[in-house]
């Protein structure tokens, strides 16, 4: 399949060849090592039968796949929005790039709901917080998002304009089917999970306020972490979806109006690049803030430094592997909550819960 040459809008590609690639390079440098550490820490959480680790692991995998596409997008922007790697790579890397946005939002929503169940209903919904359940939910997330965003794989995604720019996965103005797909992405892929996160945060606040025995410092930690879930989605993804919705709505009303597309072109590309910061925020917030994962990462760094400083690296590597053997014994739902850094323990009367952030059981 060749490129399609179309009479498109006159967008100035010279305006955004600095900010997006600079931000992507930063995300590669910071996000790649932190997500590798986050993936390892999440794996250890899964080995300890902690369902939160399943969501963290899937989130890290999605972020790493996304980061692998960034070098080509850096090249694309440095060439002033000119894709030189062929139609096949455009489809593949564009599909991974854009689908990751909604996979990440979905898993952030899963984590938020899981934290709500752990804090507000630690015993009542214990079955929903098993590793098997988390694996099943994660499979549904991947299947749903990959399927819902697969339409571009069956269309040409390279567009050459009259100024000899070869756009990949973007056309100005957009096509009709793309506009309708964007509405689905905004309302179902972004707003719906964000609304669930808001409801989960509200439920967490109620549970924390109703626990008279929970220490004030613990309440602050719980509320901060829950609020950070919402903030990541809002800060990283909201600007992009506001412009995506605006572009789609304007096209559906005035399909041939290029004025709006030309005015928001630079802002749209900047907001799209800003979504990549999610790959930096995810491991820092959900692994390094989590007591169990933070402990695992600290141990990994400690043994890595000892390994690099040792005169007998092989012996140190063997010692590290021995020290880092994960627990394999089965844990009940309360122990899993402790491993995740959250615990909700019934008091003697059974009517209230005491919430604490604790390190994972060793």
UniProtKB/Swiss-Prot annotation:
Q: Where is this site: Proton sensing?
A: 155, 165, 269
Bilayer topology: Multi-pass membrane protein
Q: Which PROSITE patterns match?
A: G_PROTEIN_RECEP_F1_1, G_PROTEIN_RECEP_F1_2
Q: Per the record's keyword annotation, is DNA-binding included, yes or no?
A: no
Residue numbers spanned by region Extracellular loop 2 (ECL2):
157-172
Residues of this chain annotated as glycosylated in UniProt: 3, 164
At which residues is there a site annotated Required for activation? 145
Q: Which keywords does this Swiss-Prot/TrEMBL entry list? A: Cell membrane, Disulfide bond, G-protein coupled receptor, Glycoprotein, Membrane, Receptor, Transducer, Transmembrane, Transmembrane helix
Residues in the Cytoplasmic compartment per record: 46-49, 122-129, 211-214, 290-362
Bridged cysteine pairs (disulfide): 9-258, 90-168
Briefly state the protein's biological role. Proton-sensing G-protein coupled receptor activated by extracellular pH, which is required to monitor pH changes and generate adaptive reactions. Activated by an optimal pH of 6.8-7.2. Ligand binding causes a conformation change that triggers signaling via guanine nucleotide-binding proteins (G proteins) and modulates the activity of downstream effectors, such as adenylate cyclase. GPR4 is mainly coupled to G(s) G proteins and mediates activation of adenylate cyclase activity. May also couple with G(q) and G(12)/G(13) G proteins.
Family of the protein in this entry: Belongs to the G-protein coupled receptor 1 family.
Q: What is this protein called?
A: G-protein coupled receptor 4
């Amino acid at each position: 399949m060749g490129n399609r040459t179309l009479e498109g809008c006159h967008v100035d590609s010279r305006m955004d060849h600095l900010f997006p690639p600079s931000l992507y390079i930063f995300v590669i440098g910071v996000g790649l090592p932190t997500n590798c550490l986050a993936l390892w820490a999440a794996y250890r959480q899964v080995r300890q039968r902690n369902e939160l680790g399943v969501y963290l692991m899937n989130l890290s995998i999605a972020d790493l796949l996304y980061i692998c596409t960034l070098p080509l997008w850096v090249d694309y922007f440095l060439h002033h929005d000119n894709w030189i790697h062929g139609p096949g790579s455009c489809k593949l890397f564009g599909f991974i790039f854009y689908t990751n946005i909604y996979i990440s939002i979905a898993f952030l929503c899963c984590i938020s709901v899981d934290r709500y169940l752990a804090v507000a209903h630690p015993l009542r919904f214990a079955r929903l917080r098993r590793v098997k359940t988390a694996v099943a939910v994660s499979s549904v997330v991947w299947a749903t998002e990959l399927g819902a965003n697969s339409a571009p794989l069956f269309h040409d995604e390279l567009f050459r304009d009259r100024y000899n720019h070869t756009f990949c996965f973007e056309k100005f103005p957009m096509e009709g089917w793309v506009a309708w797909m964007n509405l689905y992405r905004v309302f179902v892929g972004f707003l719906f999970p964000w609304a669930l996160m808001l409801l989960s945060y509200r439920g967490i606040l109620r549970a924390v306020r109703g626990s008279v025995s929970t220490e004030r410092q613990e309440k602050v930690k719980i509320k901060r972490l829950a609020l950070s879930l919402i903030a990541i989605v809002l800060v990283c993804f909201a600007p992009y979806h506001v412009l995506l919705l605006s572009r789609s709505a304007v096209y559906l009303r005035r399909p041939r109006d290029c004025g709006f597309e030309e005015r928001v072109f630079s802002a749209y590309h900047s907001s799209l690049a800003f979504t990549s910061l999610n790959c930096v925020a995810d491991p820092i917030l959900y692994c390094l803030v989590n007591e169990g994962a933070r402990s695992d990462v600290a141990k990994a760094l400690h043994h890595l430094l000892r390994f690099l400083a040792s005169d007998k690296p092989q012996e140190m590597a063997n010692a590290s592997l021995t020290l880092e053997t994960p627990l394999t014994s089965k844990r009940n739902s309360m122990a899993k909550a402790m491993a995740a850094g959250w615990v909700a323990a019934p008091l003697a009367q059974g009517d209230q819960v005491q919430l604490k952030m604790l390190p994972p059981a060793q």
